[in-house]
């Protein structure tokens, strides 16, 4: 694109900077060899405007950023509504985006008019992708990374809106040029003076547009002196420029250089032997280079063969990897299916954890009570104390059995009975403390491990489900994007078809007009009517002959088709008889 290469300010033969307009130059300054790329900073609204004609203007442009943002936003919205209709984002969303995704969607809709299949890379940074595209298109100002952070900020987003507005202008210019390409390429060749005049006019228009973008408010004001100053500078530049004098100097410098080269050739007349030696040496170097090239070609062929073998092995490994991956996916699907069939819900797992914690508290209370009772002397003081201890033991045993039945825990131990004397009471307490309590703790710990396993399994299942949902949502978004892109492509194709139809209709109207003109000419000349009548008679005779031949051909084809139908019927009868014979043979064999 224009502006990709760095302009070096190339000099002419006499050292003067060229003012020729080339694709690698911008209309910046015609008085020197300075380049646009020397300073990459965009001129601020508070800095003096750069003049095309080497006259400094110290007036300060007004900081009317709101009107600029409003104009650019309306321009972008109208463009998207014109080409995208209902798919276009709202003007409020263009002016104040909610994030980078809104800006990316707007940029894709606009840039796809230049590149139909363009889609923003998923893992690419917006600062690098968008800035690189605008730089390649020749946008005259750099887009800093701070303009994107945060998106929609007052310090950077006006620059991005201005860039999108410039991109819309490029699209409209590109479409206009593509529609009038024939006149641009094959128009009349202009004379040198006319071409120079048009070149200067184009330079003046470019500089005027640049000043207009820097200070739109002053340019749009009818009472402003902007246009008078611009015309005065243009008139002054025409008066100061003298192209004929420059052409004379250029021709003189070219003649001087040619004379210098002729003198060098005359000076080298006596060095034929050295030149021949140099030529032979160069031929020897060429021969060596050819030998080296042949060696490299042999090496290249050998490497290509090895590369083909490596690629075949790689394809085999890839196919094996795909098979293994498919087996792994099948196993994962089976595991997921088993989890869905034999698993528990999250609510049941939480309820089991609560019950487990309550059981732990009850067991701890029982353990503390047993420890306290084991420290007592177990000396019977009277009959009332024994009854009290017996009732406590029976109540504790009943509570333990209720808890175990509620937890659905089976104890394969000797049941606890009511003690009859002090010795039985002591033995039962020791049995409860040493046998029942450890067994209950062991089973509760096992139940805890089972619950933790179920919980981890359900957490893995939830993570897998979230990943699957995310993949499906991404797939849905991609499908929506593809559908929208296909719809835009179809709409563009319909527009192109409409344009083609319009051109065909215009051509048809032209042909009708030409036909009318020819008919008028035919009426004026009677000989043409006679020729037309003769030609019509010949055409009618030819048509009758054609009809007769066609009827003869139809009759011949119909006869051939009848014969083919008869032969097909005979073949079908033979086929049926053959099937009957085969059925008889099968029955005989069976």
UniProtKB/Swiss-Prot annotation:
Name where it mostly resides.
nucleus
> Which Pfam families does the UniProt record give?
Ndc80_HEC (PF03801)
For this protein, the record's Gene3D superfamilies field holds: Ncd80 complex, Ncd80 subunit
Q: Which UniProt keywords apply?
A: Cell cycle, Cell division, Centromere, Chromosome, Coiled coil, Cytoplasm, Cytoskeleton, Kinetochore, Meiosis, Mitosis, Nucleus
Q: What happens when the gene is disrupted?
A: RNAi-mediated knockdown results in embryonic lethality. RNAi-mediated knockdown results in defective cell division characterized by irregular chromosome segregation, premature spindle pole separation and defective formation of kinetochore-microtubule attachments. In addition there is reduced localization of the spindly-like protein spdl-1 to kinetochores.
Q: Which InterPro entries match?
A: Kinetochore_Ndc80, Ndc80_CH, Ndc80_sf
The reported effect of residue 44 to A is: Rescues embryonic lethality and chromosome segregation defects in single knockdown mutant
Instruction: Give the UniProt subcellular location, in the record's own words.
Output: Nucleus; Chromosome, Centromere, Kinetochore; Cytoplasm, Cytoskeleton
* Gene Ontology molecular function: any one: protein-containing complex binding
* Coiled coil location: 269-342, 450-525
What are its GO biological-process terms? attachment of mitotic spindle microtubules to kinetochore; attachment of spindle microtubules to kinetochore; cell division; gonad morphogenesis; meiotic cell cycle; mitotic chromosome movement towards spindle pole; positive regulation of kinetochore assembly; positive regulation of mitotic sister chromatid separation
GO cellular component terms, semicolon-separated: cytoplasm; kinetochore; microtubule; Ndc80 complex; nucleus
Name the PANTHER family on file. KINETOCHORE PROTEIN NDC80, KINETOCHORE PROTEIN NDC80 HOMOLOG
Query: According to its UniProt entry, what is the function of this protein?
Result: Acts as a component of the essential kinetochore-associated ndc-80 complex, which is required for chromosome segregation in mitosis and meiosis and spindle checkpoint activity. Plays a role in kinetochore assembly and recruits the checkpoint protein mdf-2 and the spindly-like protein spdl-1 to unattached kinetochores. Mediates the formation of end-on kinetochore-microtubule attachments through recruitment of spdl-1. The ndc-80 complex synergistically enhances the affinity of the ska-1 complex for microtubules and may allow the ndc-80 complex to track depolymerizing microtubules.
Complexes and interactors? Component of the NDC80 complex, which is composed of at least ndc-80 and him-10. The NDC80 complex interacts with knl-1. Interacts with the RZZ complex components rod-1 (via N-terminus) and zwl-1.
What family does the Swiss-Prot or TrEMBL record give for this protein?
Belongs to the NDC80/HEC1 family.
Q: What protein name is recorded for this chain? A: Kinetochore protein ndc-80
Q: What is the lineage of its organism?
A: Eukaryota, Metazoa, Ecdysozoa, Nematoda, Chromadorea
